[in-house]
Amino acid sequence: MNGRRPISAALLGAALLLVTACGGGGGSDAGSDGKGKADKAAEANKPSEAVVTIAPKDGAGGVATSGALKVTADKGTLSQVEVEDSKGNPVQGEITGGGTSWTPAHHLAASTKYKVHAVAKDSAGRESAKDSSFTTLTPQNTFVGTFTPEDGSKVGVGMPFSVRFTRGITHPEDVEKAISIKTEPAVDVEGHWFGNDRLDFRPEKYWAAGTKVTVKMNLDGVEGRDGVYGKQVRTVKFTVGRSQVSTVDAKKHMMTVERDGKVIKKIPVTTGKPGYDTWNGQMVISERLRVTRMNGDTVGYGGEYDIKDVPHAMRLTNSGTFIHGNYWGGGTFGNVNSSHGCVGLADVRGGYDKKVSAAWFFDRSMVGDVVVVKNSHDQTVAPDNGYNGWNMSWADWKK
């Protein structure tokens, strides 16, 4: 005898039945689940049906700065598009067309290399990615904009942000779109073109005192006219000072100076005599000169006057209208209009006396202050004759 106890047939049968039942049932379920999981895994491992296309093609050079960059997805939708220049600056854009198209929000810079990374998903959620790079064109002809006020300036409430371009602009909408203005407190600011080389920006009413203005000029790569591109990227910040608006009544020979809505002084003046009447309308001080020469030859009044030391002069128009000190006018101030179109205030030769009207007004004025002339026999000043767009209605300004 080997000492082992025999296993009964009944126990052996029960054991076989147990193994068969567990093994058989488990085997059947595992086969079903395994096939399902395998099918899902196989489906997930299939290549995505989504196709990403980037224009321009990879490695392209001389690419246009506007209208050339576009990312599209076929048989899927875009989930991610990243574009950046060689310095890592991102290009903002928008996915449209139900997720099938992406375009940049603005033009690209010239002579710049860009990298594009785009991802799309098909209906099963499988991703397809594509990377590309290209370089924009190097322009042969360029333009810039000279502007006023300067960065860091403090100006009066009437001062627009004015840009004068070195080339005539034939694509004004593209150029205007490249200049953005933000203010604190916020106010709607609109641009208006005077001819094809000057663009002014202003709010509907005079700036509120204390307004902070930030201008971003992103002109690099903007095609201002066929084959002529901007090359300028600048940020300009300026602040609006206190409010000062002075009203000249040519009929009464009197100027009323208002500071922050309150009258602070009334000053006797002389304006343009018959035939040389002063412009009516709202005029903005664009230049301050403690002493300057005024020669009638420069404004079409040849031989009529040549005064080498006009004191306390502030320009109101490009055509030669000033508000200035007058030491030769005698008793005209407050009594009679005797000038060749300027607004004259009593002064002394050399402008040394701080107590006279012209010195007082000069010392309390800044570029951007407003001088309004009324009751003159001349027409209203043209909006582009100086920074005098305030003489246009808001509706006309926005056209």
Which sequence ranges carry the predicted segments?
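Acidic, low-complexity Ser/Thr/Gly/Pro-rich repeat segments typical of extracellular/periplasmic
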Residues: 2-242, 269
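Soluble periplasmic/extracytoplasmic beta-strand elements of cell-envelope proteins
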Residues: 53, 70-72, 82, 115, ...
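Conserved beta-strand and immediately adjacent loop positions that scaffold enzyme active sites
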Residues: 80, 117, 178, 254, ...
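Short, charged beta-turn/beta-strand-edge "cap" motif at the junction between a beta-strand
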Residues: 120-122, 219-222, 261, 291, ...
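Exported/periplasmic cell-wall-interacting domains
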Residues: 157, 296-399
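Gly/Pro-biased beta-strand-loop elements
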Residues: 227-331
